[in-house]
C-alpha cells in the first residue's frame, strides 16, 4: 500500500479503525457527518492558501497510462477474449448506462475497459472481494433507475461465472420485481 501515503480512516465502528492499515488520522464517526464538517474547513483553507497544484500528479498519471496501456491477447482458438466483450459492450451501450460488476478478473477488465461518460455510473464492491455482489447490486441499481430516472438509465452487469453462481438464484427476484437488467456473463 502506497508507502508514502498519509491515511485518514473514517469509520463509524471504532473496531474498524486501523484494522488493515495504521491510520495516520483516525476519525470515528459517520462518514457523511464527518465529511460535511470537513468540507467547509477545506474550502476555508483553499481560500487562505489556494488549492494545491496537481499538474505534476496529473502528468504522472498520464505517463503511467501511456507507459502501461490496457492490452490483452486475442485468443487463437476462435473464442472471444472476455476483455473484447467488455470493450464492445462499452462501445455499444447507452452512454447513460449504469455499470455493475461482480468480483473477479472481469471486475478489473470492466474497470479498465468501460468508458464512463458521467459520474455515478459504476457500482462495484471495490477491493472487498465480495463474490456474488454483482447480481443483487444490479437489481438494486435497476430499481433505483426506475424510481429516480424513469428507467432511462439501463443497467448492465458484467459478471464472471464463479461470482454469478454465488447469487444466481436472485434471477427469480429480478424477474418478480420486473427489473430488466442486462447481464454479460464471462466464463474465463
Which ranges hold each PLM region?
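Thiamine diphosphate
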Residues: 17-28, 32-38, 109-188
